[in-house]
Every structure is written in C-alpha cells, then in structure tokens.
From Swiss-Prot:
One of its GO terms (cellular component) is cytoplasm. It comes from the Bacteria. The lineage of its organism: Bacteria, Bacillati, Bacillota, Bacilli, Bacillales. The gene is ruvA. This is Holliday junction branch migration complex subunit RuvA. Residues 63-141 are annotated as: Domain II. Keywords: Cytoplasm, DNA damage, DNA recombination, DNA repair, DNA-binding. It comes from Bacillus mycoides (strain KBAB4). Residues 142-152 are annotated as: Flexible linker.
C-alpha cells in the first residue's frame, strides 16, 4: 500500500518512531527506532503495511533490502512481526542469510522467539530463495560513523536502550545479563542498543 514515507522524526520510542508528513503523524514500528534521530532534516522510511483481523500497523526500514528480508521472514510459520524485527535489529542480517543457506540452526536459535523448530522452518522455507536479498546493501546496525565517545550518554539513554531490548522480546534475565557491561560505557541510546545486541548474540551458544 505504501512504498515509503518521507517526513520529519517527531518522536522516538522503544518500539516505534513517529514521522510527521504534512501535519499527519505516522506511527512506524522499526527494528531499532533509535537509528532515527529527531532533526530538521527530512528522512525517508521504507514501509510495510501489515494488516490482520485484529491489527493494522506500519513497519519501517532504512533500506528496501531490509524490508524485503522482513517480508520473507513473515512468510515463515512461527515468525510474526515482532520476531522478524528482533532478527533485523541484531545488525547481522547478512549472517542470517548465510545461516539459512548453510543450515546453521545454532546461529538462528540465538534470536528471541526462535527455537529449533522455527529455525528449521526458516531453512526449509527460505533456503535458495534469498538471491534477491543482497547482504552488502543492509545497514550494519552495529557500525557507526561516529566514535562511541563522540556523544556522552546518561542513565536515560541506558534505560531507553533496555526498554527497546524488552520490546524486541528479550527476557528480563537476558537484559540483566548485559547491564554490568553496559554500565562501563557512556553511549547514546542507539549505541547502547547495538552494544547490547552484540553482547547478547555473542554470548548465546
């Protein structure tokens, strides 16, 4: 229905952003809302209009390729929008594609809500069907053009990041496990999220 929305970021929260376009605020759920910063510069968000009997929502992405993988993940039995967003938020979408092609279930079960059965279903449904998804085109959500020290964070930024992790489906025990490491840093909300996701995925085996 919508290819993309252009406008200005009016609100950034743990689960979604609000984009103002001609006086209308669009609530758009994204993998990591904090990659979108409030500014006077107009941005473009590629969208997916999700409609079911009990829900209608807009999901947004920085690239068409990111959106493409999201839609393919939704086609897998056992994966809903929240699970697909958690996979994309990891910043390892290229590795997800590689894991599917190489039938690496151990990597796939690292994500919240993905057990062995769902991982196997992802492989069965998507292996050999991701040729149009180019990993190099994905935004690496762990990388940043700024040094982590360029903007000092605070407890507010850390709290926002932890809320974002919970919104993605990570259990409280998992979130608590990475807090000591995050407390050693002084980062922005976006950087805290990237750091936490890196710790969570690298720590799961």
């Amino acid at each position: 229905m919508f290819e993309y929305v252009t406008g200005y970021v009016e609100y950034v929260g743990p689960e979604y952003v609000v984009i103002d376009h001609n006086g209308i605020g669009y609530q758009i759920f994204t993998p990591n809302p904090y990659v979108f910063q409030r500014s006077k510069q107009e941005i473009r968000v590629y969208t997916y209009h999700y409609v079911r009997e009990d829900i209608m929502a807009l999901y947004g992405f920085k690239t068409r390729e990111e959106r493409l993988l999201f839609t393919k993940l939704l086609g897998v039995s056992g994966i809903g929008p929240k699970g697909a967003l958690a996979i994309l938020a990891s910043g390892q979408t290229g590795q997800v594609v590689q894991a599917i092609e190489h039938e690496d279930e151990k990597f796939l079960v690292k994500f919240p809500g993905v057990g062995k059965k769902t991982a196997r279903q992802m492989i069965l449904d998507l292996k050999g069907k991701l040729a149009d998804v180019v990993p190099d085109a994905f935004v690496d959500l762990f990388s940043d053009t700024e040094s982590f020290d360029t903007k000092k964070g605070s407890s507010v930024e850390l709290d926002e990041a932890l809320e974002a992790l919970r919104a993605l489906g990570y259990a409280e025990r998992e979130v608590s496990r990475v807090v000591p490491e995050l407390l050693k840093e002084s980062l922005t909300t976006d950087q805290y999220i990237k750091k936490a996701l890196s710790l969570l995925l690298n720590g799961k085996r």
